[in-house]
Amino acid sequence: MRKYLQLVFLAVSVFCSEILFAESRDPVRILDLRTLNELDLKEQEKAEQLWDIMHTTATLQGIVNRNSPRLYIRYVKNGQGENVDDYWWNKYRQAGQWLAGRDTIAYTELSDVVTVFRKEIRGVVVYDSKVASTSNIASSVAGIENLIAVRYDISPNSLYTRLVLQGPKLAVKCWLVNKDGSSLFTGKGRIAGTGQPSTGSLKIDPYVWFIEKYLKKGLCNTEYAAYYIDQFWRTDPTRTVTNHHQLTNHDFFVSKKAFFFDLSPWGDEPATDDPTQEEGLDLQILKTFLQEAYKQNKGEKFCYIGGFPSWIYKYTQHAGGKHEDVATEWEFSRIISAYNAFKDADAIGLGALANSSFWQHFPLQEKYPQKWVTHQELMDRGYLNRDGTINFQGRNFILFYVGDYDSSSWIAQTTPFLWDEPSRGEVPLMWSVSPVLAERVPMVMHNYRVTATPNDYFAAADNGAGYLMPGMLQEPRSVSGLKSGLSAWAKHCSKYYQKWGLTITGFVIDGEAPGLDSDGLDCYASFSPNGIVPQKMPLTLLHNDMPVIRADYDIVDHDYRRATDVIVERVEKRPVPFHWFRAILKSPSWYKGICDELKQRHTNIELLDAPTFFELYRIYLKQHPDAAAGKITMN
């Protein structure tokens, strides 16, 4: 029997080795789409060209990269003008890195790449130019059915003409438009292929079709969803950065067979992109998606939603709605949290992310541990007296929440000009990064850890392993009526915190959700025992042994001198010697400038590393019962 098992093991080992060897021999196809960045998108034809190429490419990538990394594109530029796709490719192309020695074949024409992978795809899903939401339905169907998405357009140079009517003449397996180009979804009568009455909305009927034909039948993977703008983008492609069509972001979610949507979270007005619809219809369908995902995930697994409200285009005052940008962000978070879903927040400005279906195969280490400070070390460094009391010497201690790194696209785009800045490491910084981003950009997360200095420490970003509002996990859950999601959240977060050596949650956005109650605090204490920073809490609190400090000011000024003014003024007003400040996308040199300025002004304010800050704060709470009990208030 032992000999038999040895032979089986040997055969399996040889088989696995052959697979790995075959993968290493299989060249990576690299499609260069950089010229699309130069198109004049004020011309309708150019905007359509960009949209069509990026959409078909992303759905193709999602299919062919599902099981191994085979197709890479060059396209996304960050705000500094640097090509992000080239940056990451070149980093891991170096000797000894993951892509070193891998053969490549370069392409400039999408049709050539489609020909290469023709046997990998079953055909095409064709969608309707006149019904914007069908583009998102096409991405959903593409992943489930192994189809590439192509917009119906019979003009001579369109992709539809070049791939379906001519060229390879790919078979159309799913029509989201009639074959003559007239709309399949009309907002009248019954919804095609379902027997369901029309909602009266051109936008919503395709979503109902998808829910009936695919979602309710269990055909898509409800652990993943994608919240990206639909074809409405083509109405004004230059309203913000031109890569905010975010079609590049589709590939990962296509590979996961996710469902795609672009819906308003507001129930008190029609969606701004569909003003004649019944008030709150978008929200109704959003809840249907989330409820069905919760049901299929059995309330045990969370739904990972990539994306963010496209607030400059839809659902806010920018688009003629009632609500402000942040309010819309928070309302979307509040709603999805009620159904055990969180978002990976690809927000406008830095929201484009390519090649995640490729990078998802990047090999991570088993664990990335971080060391916590000991009391002996605090004594040796002069922060703790021998009797266990804190050696303040008149000092106030501050900590920066270095954010916002709750988005895969944001950390991929900002690494070249923020993380790589030469001054990083000169002052202690608490880099607050959501560990769930390792799903889409593991190469970024790995790079952070292997290039970190002793002054770089990592905490989880808002609000743990994903951006949701944890108060909406607590019972009673008025939006959804579901049972508590706290135990599922603790289980979900624990896996990521353990892998990445995290014990601090650097910020908890409560927004318009309830604050954490005792059960919510117990939940966080189970995976974030060394500290949390919520919004709706007393100024100070010790929950069992977990230190809790209420979130305070955002420091937004780009001038570090004026930023220092705000910090000094705030520290003088606060009644406790521990202070948390949040900053968004600030450079290491900005933080160093503040520290230098504090010293030059001879203030008593000192920036600490995260373990020292939270451990001293815990000691302080234990030695000050009123502070531990949450009885300290602002004057």
Set out the residue ranges of the language-model regions.
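Substrate-binding cleft of extracellular glycoside hydrolase catalytic domains
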Residues: 434-495, 499-500
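Positively charged n-region of N-terminal signal peptides that target proteins for export
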Residues: 1-4
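Preference for solvent-exposed, low-hydrophobicity sequence contexts
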Residues: 23-366
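Active-site beta->alpha N-cap acidic-glycine motif
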Residues: 356-449
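Short loop/turn segments at strand-loop or loop-helix junctions that form parts
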Residues: 127-130, 306-310, 396, 400-405, ...
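Bacterial N-terminal signal peptides
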Residues: 7-18
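Catalytic grooves of carbohydrate-active enzymes
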Residues: 282-310, 398, 403-412, 416, ...
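A recurrent domain-boundary module in secreted/ectodomain proteins
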Residues: 348-376, 613-635
